[in-house]
Curated annotation (Swiss-Prot):
Record field: catalytic activity: K(+)(out) + ATP + H2O + H(+)(in) = K(+)(in) + ADP + phosphate + 2 H(+)(out)
Biased composition (Polar residues): 221-236
Topology of the protein relative to the lipid bilayer: Multi-pass membrane protein
Region (Disordered): 221-241
Residues annotated as the enzyme's active site: D383 (4-aspartylphosphate intermediate)
Record's keyword terms, sorted: ATP-binding, Hydrogen ion transport, Ion transport, Magnesium, Membrane, Metal-binding, Nucleotide-binding, Phosphoprotein, Potassium, Potassium transport, Translocase, Transmembrane, Transmembrane helix, Transport
Gene3D superfamilies to which the protein is assigned, alphabetical: Calcium-transporting ATPase, cytoplasmic domain N, Calcium-transporting ATPase, cytoplasmic transduction domain A, Calcium-transporting ATPase, transmembrane domain, HAD superfamily/HAD-like
Similarity remark: Belongs to the cation transport ATPase (P-type) (TC 3.A.3) family. Type IIC subfamily.
Subcellular location: Membrane
Protein name: Potassium-transporting ATPase alpha chain 1
Gene Ontology molecular function, alphabetical: ATP binding; ATP hydrolysis activity; metal ion binding; P-type potassium:proton transporter activity; P-type sodium:potassium-exchanging transporter activity
Length: 1031
């Protein structure tokens, strides 16, 4: 018995014994390990040989017949064994658990504790009949409201990420045509089983993974699975050892574009290629974003410090002689003062604002935290088709008259490089226009040709558009050359031909035109047209053809050959019955007209975007399902492989030595295909990524895309992945940020992604990177501003407990600071423009460049925070002194001050104060401390505009939102001070004008002090001063 079997049996025995917690623990561990094993097995390439074995072996393997299909009774047994042909959704977390998690984070737990203490304190005070305010009750309600509101928002954000499996279900066909017991009928696709004989036709979705048995011109769209934009022929022939590339396998959910086929089902449900992708997509990912990790790190520090200081003050209070309840209230007050209740709201609003800015630039952000993640990105793994390229085949080059010409596909033809009056071009253009089944959708006369919709495959679409631009109206042209018959392209002949009558009614000959694979077309020709004359196709011209063919193929372009033949009018007179099955007409001895190559061209904005990424220290890796030659050519044209960079193969060709003799370290670029990647270990892949800065992966499977992303992450990279197909969804989910295409993207890709590009343009990602970097800088400024207030909020309680003075600042006042006056200035910093060209800096290192570092904390707490505390205490003691309470007299006064029964407490002048008068004076002190803090925070928000540049260089009033926030802050301060009723509700009092002026010198000091700091940082980059003072 194997080790795993023993383990499984052990878990069952434990369950039977009912040994409590151990039973559950072992079973959970077993379940988790099974899930991990299943996920790892899904990452491996599908290991099947159903495409390699003979039809007879296939029948024997699945107990079926290629003529009669399965027996119904046996099919019923198989469905009981394997289950229905559908994708099973993973077990999800209950919604109430998700919501509960949002209410129980690090900060939230602290705030719950503080709220409970407040309620207990209020309850005890009420039961004792003390004449106190309802501050503790208000505080508890406010804290609970903050936790619930932020929790609801967090839950909403999580809820928006819908179940990945749901999007895959849209790809599953509802009905399928099946043959059982020799009878053909339609059944629900989920009732299909392995071994069933099914039929598909143009317009159907393939109902499972099937081995093709018969085919008539069947073509399928594999683009969402493999990334190949061209329709793929499906036929019974075994053409490749890889099941993804052989022609005799059709995959579950792919669309049959044309033709018909029959096949035997070899996989159903979760065992199909699409099922494995769905399982991978739902099983990977869900890792925390860099900004979430940063905030969690910051929250842990804050929570730890809050508990430490709260506990310290609690112990000190107990030692000094305060009651347990009073000491607990101190603990609560310290927690409230130390915890930045408005931080989560500030971060969320800042990220939302950036997301809105990105939306205006065609980037829709699904996960707010992804905004900053994009700014941290150090590697972009980009799909080719539709992202780097335009996802439309376009004529690129032509070869005729022994010259390669670049094609101009613009309507004005101003850049055309060949003579359009040439006889050879006329002959070639005639073949291109006539030997083509594609046609324009009606009613598009006013639309530019490149934007018109064409009914036909990608290659023929490119050719018919080129003909329309160069020749004129193709449909009218075809009408002049009436088509008599045609032979569609098939995988055996590898050519397409059609026979036409000539437009001259006196010329009774037929014209036969043919196009197809260049080498197959050439072997059917005996002559070649050069400058309008037919010349014998000798070795010289064959060599010229081969050179041109290799040159065009080397550019990664798809090349087609064209030829024609005028049939003898005596042998093939008008009305001749052409038989396309028997081919009762010549298919050799034709005249070769030329070559035309096509390519899916790069988007115009991509090379510049790739260059910006390179400048920003971001590595762009191409990961595509397309051919290595095409992938390399596109990579070179957009700058992923830079000019002058060579692969190992390029170096070997240049030095004329075997590839094995080339030192891999000499090759800056590397192109790895799926077959090579399959043979590589994870260590070898990581080593290749380290060794070659410029990488291209071609012919990759969905599992391999996922492995590439994981390998980049092992190197410590923050990885962004772009994609549009179903095959991209596991990699999109696993990446630190997944970016899906909005136009060409599948639902599965969009659901797996964190961001969607509405214009499918790679250049939009660069905009996102820039905005992501900017928001990290601005969040740093916002948090520095937010943290500064912790010291002036904490210091009053420190002096209150240790020096026993009347409380300078109340909890309700602190909450107004946290949740009202400070929110707007901190959010306004999100609108601050960059200090420098942030796209010329390297991506931040998540392990080193923290959102909150030591320099930021020290500067905010112990420099600016201390100055603000001094401002508050100077104003506090000034107010007390002006009312008759000199500083020396105030020290140690707390117990008498708070004694409700003492109605004749004397001040420094001997004046007697009742408890209500003292309470009024205390609320006045709260207000004065609040106002002094507000004045200093105006200076604080101004200095936070920059971290290195002078504020004068950045500009005082360029950030209009910040100016509005400062005005709002001052207006709110005035409203709280002078609005009638505030003393009874929120304990704010009207204060004298001169008390507003006391903190002004401290505000000026903060500004001057920070300008000196920035000057030192700019003057001495890299010095100890820079390291300690630049945050």
């Amino acid at each position: 018995m194997g080790k795993k079997e023993q383990y499984d049996m052990y878990s069952v025995e434990m369950e039977r014994e009912g040994d409590g917690a151990m039973d559950v623990k072992v079973m959970k561990k077993n379940k988790a390990s099974k899930k991990k094993e299943k996920l790892e097995s899904m990452k491996k390439e599908m290991d099947i040989n159903d495409h390699e074995i003979t039809v007879e072996e296939l029948e024997q393997k699945y107990t079926t017949s290629v003529s009669k299909g399965l027996k119904s009774a046996f099919a019923a047994e198989v469905i009981l064994r394997d289950g229905p042909n559908e994708l099973k959704p993973p077990k999800g977390t209950p919604e109430y658990i998700k919501f509960a998690r949002q209410l129980a984070g690090g900060l939230q737990c602290l705030m719950w504790v503080a709220a409970v203490i407040c309620l207990i304190a209020f309850g005890i005070e009420e039961s004792q009949g003390d004449l106190t305010s309802a501050d503790n009750l208000y505080l508890a309600i406010t804290l609970i409201a903050v936790v619930v509101v932020t929790g609801c928002f967090g839950y909403y954000q999580e809820f928006k990420s819908t179940n990945i499996i749901a999007s895959f279900k849209n790809l599953v066909p509802q009905q399928a045509t099946v043959v059982r017991d020799g009878d053909k009928f339609q059944i629900n696709a989920n009732q299909l089983v392995v071994g069933d004989l099914v039929e598909i036709k143009g317009g159907d979705r393939v109902p499972a993974d099937i081995r093709i048995i018969t085919s008539q011109g069947c073509k399928v769209d594999n683009s969402s699975l493999t990334g190949e934009s061209e329709p793929q022929t499906r036929s019974p022939e075994y053409t490749h050892e890889s099941p993804l590339e052989t022609r005799n396998i059709a995959f579950f959910s792919t669309m049959c574009l044309e033709g018909t086929a029959t096949g035997i089902i070899i996989n159903t449900g979760d065992r199909t290629i699409i099922g494995r992708i769905a399982t991978l997509a739902s099983g990977v990912g869900n890792e925390k974003t860099p900004i979430a990790i940063e905030i969690e790190h910051f929250v842990d520090i804050i929570a730890g410090l809050a508990i430490f200081f709260g506990a310290t003050f609690f112990v000190v209070a107990m030692v000094i002689g305060y009651t347990f309840l009073r000491a607990m209230v101190f603990f609560m007050a310290i927690v409230v003062a130390y915890v930045p209740e408005g931080l989560l709201a500030t971060v969320t609003v800042c990220l939302s604002l950036t997301a809105k800015r990105l939306a205006r630039k065609n980037c829709v952000v699904k996960n707010l935290e992804a905004v900053e993640t994009l700014g941290s990105t150090s590697v972009i793994c980009s799909d080719k088709t539709g992202t780097l390229t335009q996802n439309r085949m376009t004529v690129s080059h032509l070869w005729f008259d022994n010259h390669i010409h670049s094609a101009d596909t613009t309507e004005d033809q101003s850049g055309q490089s060949f003579d359009q009056t040439s006889d050879t071009w006329r002959a070639l253009s005639k073949v291109v226009s006539l030997c083509n089944r594609a046609f324009f959708k009606s009613g598009q006369d006013g639309i530019p040709v490149p934007k018109r919709i064409v009914i036909g495959d990608a290659s023929e679409t490119a050719l018919v558009k080129f003909s329309e631009i160069t020749v004129g109206n193709v449909m009218e042209y075809r009408e002049r050359f009436k088509k008599v018959t045609e032979v569609p392209f098939n995988s055996t002949n590898k050519f397409q031909l059609s026979i036409h009558e000539l437009q001259d009614p006196l010329d009774l000959r037929y014209l036969m035109v043919m196009k197809g694979a260049p080498e197959r077309i050439l072997e059917r020709c005996s002559t070649i047209m050069i400058k309008g004359q037919e010349l014998p196709l000798d070795e010289q011209w064959k060599e010229a053809f081969q050179t041109a063919y290799m040159d065009l193929g080397g550019l990664g372009e798809r090349v087609l050959g064209f030829c024609h033949l005028y049939l003898n009018e005596k042998e093939y007179s008008r009305g001749f019955n052409f038989d396309t099955e028997e081919m009762n007409f010549p298919t050799s001895g034709l005249c070769f007209a030329g070559l035309i190559s096509m390519i899916d061209p790069p988007r115009a904005t991509v090379p510049d975007a790739v260059m910006k990424c390179r400048t920003a220290g971001i590595r762009v890796i191409m990961v595509t399902g397309d051919h290595p030659i095409t992938a390399k050519a596109i990579a070179a044209s957009v700058g992923i492989i830079s000019e002058g960079s060579e692969t190992v193969e390029d170096i070997a060709a240049r030095l004329r030595i075997p590839v094995e003799q080339v030192n891999k370290r000499d090759a800056r670029a590397c192109v790895i295909n799926g077959g090579q990647l399959k043979e590589m270990s994870s260590e070898e892949l990581v080593e290749a990524l380290k060794l070659h800065p410029e990488m291209v992966f071609a012919r990759t499977s969905p599992q391999q895309k996922l492995i590439i992303v994981e390998s980049c992450q092992k190197l410590g990279a923050i990885v962004a992945v772009t994609g549009d197909g179903v095959n991209d969804s596991p990699a999109l989910k696993k990446a630190d940020i997944g970016v899906a295409m909005g136009i060409a993207g599948s639902d599965a890709a969009k659901n797996a992604a964190d961001m969607i590009l509405l214009d499918d343009n790679f250049a939009s990602i660069v905009t996102g990177v820039e905005q992501g970097r900017l928001i990290f800088d601005n969040l740093k400024k916002s948090i520095a501003y937010t943290l500064t207030k912790n010291i002036p909020e904490l210091a009053p309680y420190l002096i209150y407990i240790t020096a026993s003075v009347p409380l300078p600042l109340g909890c309700i006042t602190i909450l107004f600071i946290e949740l009202c006056t400070d929110i707007f200035p901190s959010v306004s910093l999100a609108y601050e423009r960059a200090e420098s060209d942030i796209m010329h800096l390297k991506p931040r290192n998540p392990r080193r460049d923290r959102l909150v570092n030591e320099a930021l904390a020290v500067y905010s707490y112990f420099q600016i925070g201390i100055i603000q505390s001094f401002a508050g205490f100077v104003d506090y003691f000034t107010v007390m002194a002006q009312e008759g309470w000199f500083p020396a007299y105030v020290l140690g006064l707390r117990s008498h001050w708070e004694n409700q029964h003492l109605q004749d407490l004397q001040d420094s002048y001997g004046q007697e104060w009742t408890f209500s008068q003292r309470l009024y004076q205390q609320y006045t002190c709260y207000t004065v401390f609040f106002i002094s803090y507000e004045i200093c925070q105006i200076s604080d928000v101004l200095i936070r505009k920059t971290r290195r540049l002078s504020v004068f260089q950045q500009g005082f009033f360029r950030n209009k939102v910040l100016v509005i926030a400062i005005v709002f802050q001052l207006c709110l301060g005035n409203f709280l001070c002078y609005c009638p009723g505030m003393p009874n509700v929120f304990n704010f009092m009207p204060i004298r004008f001169q008390w507003w002026l006391v903190p002004l010198p401290f505000g000026i000091l903060i500004f001057v002090y920070d300008e000196i700091r920035k000057l030192g940082v700019r003057r001495h980059p890299g010095s100890w001063f820079d390291k300690e003072m630049y945050y």
